[in-house]
Amino acid sequence: MKRKKLFARGLIIVTAVCMALASVACKKDVPHEEKPQNTVTKGSAWFTENGRSDYKIVVSSEARDEITFAKEELIYFVEQIADCKLETVSDRFAAYDEKSTYISLGRNELFEKTDIDLSAANVGNSGYVIQSVGNTVFITGDGAYDYGTIFGVYEFLKYTFGMEIYATDCITYNAEKNVKMPVFDVKERPDTDRFYFEGARTDYIGATRLGMINVTSFCASMAQGHSLTGILKMSSDYVGKDWLTAQDQLCFSASEMYPVFAKNLIRIIDENPDASRFFLGNSDAVTQCTCNRCIAMKEEYHTNSAGLMMIFFNHVLDTVCAYTDAHYPDRGIEFSTYAYEGVFEPPVKSDGNGGYIPDSEAVIPHKRLKIMFTPLLINNMYTLDEVPNKANFESLIGWASVASEIEMYGYNYYTRSTTVTSGTFNTFSDTIRRLKDAGCTYYYEEGPTRGENFVQLKLYVQSKLCKDTTLSYDETAYDFIEHYYGPAAGAMKKFYQLFKNYYASNRENMPGVCQTPISSIYSVKFLQENFLNTQISLLEEANCAIEDLKTEDRQAYETYLWRIREEEFPARVNRLQVYSSSMSATKIKEEVEKIRNWPNSLPNGSKYEAPGSQLGVVVKYDTYFTNLLK
């Protein structure tokens, strides 16, 4: 069976080059549990045959945008893989019996005629059921939004055509045009109910194809992030009152403020009918109220500032949820707040047996309030149970012991403004497993906006691990490298292992938290010269590995070249940042011109740019390069 690779939505298709996995000396991740297997067996009915299909897609006549997107993705990929364009029919006009040949997407009239029980399947917000009933296949997600149906479509394509999405511009599948429809009995709930990795590569299509859901896209702008003060100030009721500190932080003990805040929050909900997520975060980088009422309230409930905030939310959300349940029972409205600066420590105490109990019944978070744990000082060079992170992790466990739902706001640390990658290669798999065990249902990572190493690899690998925490980080990374770099995979695996080993053996010298000063990152202690030189040497080896493609397959050559350069850019920039003072003027000029000329250096003026290409960072660094040449 031939294996094909889809390089971009522009539909440049080339034959994939199969390569053996290079043996690498490393400690493998050890899965901590086994997962039950779903049942997918061979069917007898043809799905696609000689460019045609008897199957039609059925969607509701009132389908949400997510169902429309799922339908478009199914049509798109089947047409590209099997040269067969599927037709769509509304559920109002789909005559249904056991012999019908339909692919039903989401909840619709056909689905309601089945015995499929989504509640019993318990698939969460991003899980799905793929179920054969007769010749018809039902792909259905649950939750207020239909992302599960989208993800179910990708899983259907994986089972049917062997399709795997490594990146928006790297999708593999089995090149078979005549395929029989499998018989499905699949119920899938990802280990992390929802996750999202922020960054330059996570446009809607790219993120969705990797299984991400960005819950901030469901938010009303007035109730997103650090929103409490803004919500209170929507009306003038606060004027002349002592409800705010001098720094505009709410005074949570001001009980007369509670109904005013609830009224304003209800107004936001009314005015934003498409929003379902409402973040209720206190002001950023501002101390908590220390008035006499707050001090007295803490003493009364034997609690801390976070406890006062929970008391405030409990009163407000009792009012708001009674309103939303009556007026918007089907909107799936949810609320969350940050466990962050000033309210980071949970309102709990030891139970004497290694666990935690709430400071009082009054501080137990409202059952509709999600706690988004937001630790600024987590060090990604260490696992959560190691000394640098242990206190933070205990705080997470404390929150998880009292909250109905816990979420995680992570940081891709210093990479938002540098070309230095974070060291999650050795720790992410442990982190996501511990978060799963703690009951974490959402993982959000504030990520890179510029050109660090391994952006696309991390998006793929970490997305896979969020869905299935039993996977090995290394094995998943090697699989990505194999397909993403083709003939250069051997060199790129060594490049990946270089980083893993270096970060593991030098972690005590390496800054791992998001507030690390830039001067500490671009340092001889952190970025040793031999480490940078070895990076560039391995990337030159990767370039040599694709040289034959210049004449054999020009488009494949340009694709692989650009992907290698996306790794070479930070390597060369980091070397200039730290060691330019010891370079000759000639060497500096050579290095700068090499980088500056990359966008135009391909012969015949041809150019290939991957979505969100980090080579665009050349513009950001142009002033820096100019100053170096002076």
At which residue positions do the language-model features occur?
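Aromatic-lined carbohydrate-recognition surfaces of secreted/lumenal glycan-active proteins
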Residues: 313-349, 406-413, 443-446
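Structured mid-domain segments that build the active-site/substrate or prosthetic-cofactor binding neighborhood
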Residues: 249-259, 267, 390-490, 494, ...
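Catalytic domains of carbohydrate-active enzymes that cleave complex glycans
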Residues: 465-630
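Substrate-binding cleft/loops of secretory-pathway carbohydrate-active enzymes
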Residues: 335-375, 419-424, 452-459
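Acidic, contiguous N-terminal accessory segments
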Residues: 27-129, 171, 177-188
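C-terminal motif of bacterial Sec signal peptides marking the signal peptidase cleavage site
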Residues: 22-25
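Feature activates predominantly on carbohydrate-active enzymes
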Residues: 54, 65, 70-73, 77-79, ...
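Bacterial N-terminal signal peptides that target proteins for export
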Residues: 2-14
